[in-house]
């Protein structure tokens, strides 16, 4: 692959990232396939972040720096930075991760004619001088639109065509989805709605997580596979269905509304729209509709491919299992 064939813009949004940003920038400027530009947009850092990136910009002219006069917040900051990209492809960078040195090269090779390529990341955290890996699921994930309505692919794992922005609905900033979720969820669901995501099943990013965030180290042991855990999740879902389901209906109403605003001819997209309409309602008919769609897409709607009869059993019980997955909505009431 020659360097002049495809132009890639790297977009990084920063805020008080001075502690780790050097490692990330080093991993980008040392890529085997160099980007045409590195757009760094700062949202009002009060530490030494800007001093560091200015030093790098002197050494690497491909770095373009913008500092917001007023804080934009995550979505406004990322979308405004992405829209400045001049490359045919865009790669999102967090300020504290570490990229594999061939990340851009292998993702360009993998994307083909798709809108988005998604790779894998390994989470880690620093403990003194030690670098400790965090548990993560090594199974190959599904990334079709049915699955993506319940999950997301982190921005730092993606490379996408700038053309993808043209498929976002007009006046995106005024739509409920914009304050409901993050930019990478919006981009991922848009690409999935077009049935245009390819999975690169290899690690391309080391994702730094922070030791003071307990949720990053602790594993919900009830989510680990096993008959006992499965029975507990179903029992919890049945017991709390009446409390959580109304909140889930509101949640999926926003996601479903966004999905319907995307123009796509993909057959799976049309079924995903119907599925979200069932998720957005309550009552027996909506429940039965959910079971129907879960059964139809039982092999591809869970994290990874599942064989029968396990997939069939999970599909039938999934309305209750989903209640457990969305129990966090109780804390947002």
Task: Give the label of every model feature segment.
Residues 1-221, 320:
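Nucleotide-sugar donor-binding/catalytic module of glycosyltransferases
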Residues 174-182, 186, 206-333:
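C-terminal subregions of glycosyltransferases and related glycan-biosynthesis enzymes
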């Amino acid at each position: 692959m020659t360097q002049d064939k495809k132009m890639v813009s790297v977009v990084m949004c920063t805020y008080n990232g001075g502690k780790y940003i050097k490692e990330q920038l080093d991993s980008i400027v040392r890529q085997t396939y160099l980007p045409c530009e590195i757009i760094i947009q700062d949202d009002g850092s009060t530490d030494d972040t800007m001093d560091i990136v200015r030093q790098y910009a002197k050494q690497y002219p491909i770095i373009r720096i913008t500092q917001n006069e007023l804080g934009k917040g995550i979505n406004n900051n990322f979308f405004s930075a992405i829209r400045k990209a001049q490359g045919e492809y865009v790669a999102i960078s967090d300020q504290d991760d570490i990229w594999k040195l061939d990340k851009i090269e292998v993702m360009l090779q993998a994307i083909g004619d798709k809108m988005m390529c998604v790779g894998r990341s390994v989470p880690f955290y620093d403990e003194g001088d030690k670098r400790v890996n965090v548990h993560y699921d090594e199974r190959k994930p599904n990334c079709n639109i049915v699955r993506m309505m319940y999950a997301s692919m982190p921005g730092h794992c993606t490379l996408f065509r700038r053309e993808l922005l043209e498929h976002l609905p007009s006046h995106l900033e005024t739509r409920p989805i914009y304050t409901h979720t993050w930019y990478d969820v919006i981009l991922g669901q848009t690409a999935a709605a077009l049935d245009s995501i390819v999975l690169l099943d290899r690690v391309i990013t080391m994702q730094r997580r922070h030791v003071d965030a307990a949720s990053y180290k602790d594993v919900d042991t009830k989510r680990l596979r096993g008959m006992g855990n499965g029975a507990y999740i179903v029992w919890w879902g049945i017991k709390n269905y009446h409390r959580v389901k109304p909140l889930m209906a509101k949640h999926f109403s926003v996601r479903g509304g966004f999905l319907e605003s995307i123009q796509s001819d993909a057959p799976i997209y049309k079924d995903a729209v119907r599925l979200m309409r069932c998720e957005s309602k309550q009552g027996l008919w909506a429940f039965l509709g959910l079971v129907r769609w879960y059964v139809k897409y039982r092999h591809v709607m869970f994290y990874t491919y599942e064989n029968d009869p396990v997939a069939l059993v999970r599909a039938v019980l999934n309305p209750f299992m989903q209640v457990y997955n969305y129990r966090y909505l109780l804390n947002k009431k």
